[in-house]
Amino acid sequence: MTKYALVGDVGGTNARLALCDIASGEISQAKTYSGLDYPSLEAVIRVYLEEHKVEVKDGCIAIACPITGDWVAMTNHTWAFSIAEMKKNLGFSHLEIINDFTAVSMAIPMLKKEHLIQFGGAEPIEGKPIAVYGAGTGLGVAHLVHVDKRWVSLPGEGGHVDFAPNSEEEGIILEILRAEIGHVSAERVLSGPGLVNLYRAIVKADNRLPENLKPKDITERALADSCTDCRRALSLFCVIMGRFGGNLALNLGTFGGVFIAGGIVPRFLEFFKASGFRAAFEDKGRFKEYVHDIPVYLIVHDNPGLLGSGAHLRQTLGHIL
């Protein structure tokens, strides 16, 4: 008889829950719930389990916020809870709460070739460290290493490191944004809101007033080639994505590959392919040759957060991935 675990991927707006076959890791019965409709994460889980008429005793939920102890308070939502208390209330034997990019990193060993699009570099070297990052509402970052037949995710808040300009144009943008918001992290330029910041700074640098555009507007105008400022912003976004990815590659010698997740890049895939992304990734001066062969992949799997939550839980329960 198939034994299932509950897996989830929870952001500031929605909670996506599913079942994971503990033996195979296969994800099924995925359903998305609006976080605004429920008073707590526990309430959503109870509704899901009741709707699917399934009894589970193990679970792993990925959440878009730092996980530093038993008490979890979501960054972009009012939900807050004790892991131990929720585990007890649900009657679970195991309940893991992990960072969303911990989950994405743990999905990587489970991905197939059709889930990846490669951008330069050679073949990955088996057993070498891996980096994963992704722009969405924010900028998530994690690393993954293989130790004693186990995958170990190294989460953190790498999206909040300083934005490091490497051109005159980027330096001007930094100064404009610093005057507006103070500390300018990488996330301030590599995210949906970050794309807006780039557009606004480009226009303001020319002593003009920017329009009140959303990320979707900027992307659409750039792809339609109907707005030079929007196209410059999107081009610069791709270049800075490359610089940041190259930095991750240098940090840990990620010859196992650098992986891009998140919902933004797939929206302009052909533009991204033709952009200065890879050149910026390799633009590391004396260490250009060091990163030259490191492959970069775009993850195109529909639910890497759910897949990775399942992988994390299965490994915790003793399975080898």
Swiss-Prot record:
Swiss-Prot/TrEMBL catalytic activity: D-glucose + ATP = D-glucose 6-phosphate + ADP + H(+)
Subcellular location: Cytoplasm
CC terms in the record's Gene Ontology section: cytosol
Annotated disulfide bonds: none
One Gene Ontology term of the molecular function aspect: D-glucose binding
One of the protein's GO biological processes: glycolytic process
Entries under HAMAP family matching the protein: Glucokinase
Stated name of the protein: Glucokinase
Species this protein is from: Escherichia coli O7:K1 (strain IAI39 / ExPEC)
